[in-house]
């Protein structure tokens, strides 16, 4: 299983000069793990297990992820995976291609465009599905029935996770807002189904440092007009 990359030193040829320097190359860090975290049921994993797996995937990433979404469904398609929300701030040069695609625990690619909605390619993690066709064009992927269902499922799971965090810990959600708003606002502009869910937890900051949802702002405007 691919877990990040590592540097390897190439051996020098026999006729190399005495002062020749060995060349180093970056290679995939492959680990033989027959039971990776994403293949386990969510009930089998603790919070520390998710953090440990993130460190395995991204050994050069020192910041902890904000939270994760565990994907686990076997009908009408088969999909497992773990997605992580990294701290994004307002960085417009965010590196994509951080989500790795596997089929039956065999690494395929880290380009998931056409499979994962564009706005979610800002996340990190792993998805594994035998139902995603390989070696086909992006337009073919986007037209494939199973891929459409997988894409919609991932979008819904991310929206549900964000909604749950907002409802359970409003203050904590507000504290994370500047680190996650890039994904949420991008998703609201590009995906109608995500917008329908996200408009209930998307936040608008005020100059006083308070945060309001769109519905709350409407109520405040009504109240001020009544006064």
Predicted regions and their residues:
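Conserved GHKL (Bergerat-fold) ATPase module
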Residues: 1-227
């Amino acid at each position: 299983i691919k877990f990040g990359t590592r540097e390897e030193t190439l051996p020098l040829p026999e006729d190399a000069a005495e002062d020749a320097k060995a060349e180093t190359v970056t290679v995939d860090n492959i680990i033989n793990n027959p039971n990776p975290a994403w293949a386990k049921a969510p009930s089998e994993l603790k919070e520390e297990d998710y953090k440990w797996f993130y460190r395995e995937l991204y050994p050069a990433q020192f910041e902890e992820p904000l939270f994760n979404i565990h994907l686990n469904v076997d009908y009408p398609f088969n999909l497992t995976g773990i997605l992580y929300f990294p701290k994004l701030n307002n960085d417009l040069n965010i590196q994509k291609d951080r989500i790795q695609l596997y089929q039956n625990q065999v690494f395929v690619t880290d380009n998931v465009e056409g499979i994962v909605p564009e706005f979610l390619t800002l996340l990190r993690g792993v998805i594994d599905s035998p139902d995603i066709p390989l070696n086909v064009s992006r337009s073919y992927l986007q037209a494939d029935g199973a891929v459409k269902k997988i894409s919609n499922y991932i979008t819904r799971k991310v929206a549900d996770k964000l909604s749950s965090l907002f409802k359970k810990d409003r203050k904590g959600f507000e504290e994370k807002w500047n680190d996650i708003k890039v994904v949420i606002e991008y998703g609201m502009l590009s995906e109608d189904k995500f917008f329908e869910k996200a408009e209930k937890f998307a936040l608008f900051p005020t100059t006083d440092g308070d945060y309001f949802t769109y519905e709350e702002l409407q109520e405040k405007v009504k109240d001020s007009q009544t006064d």
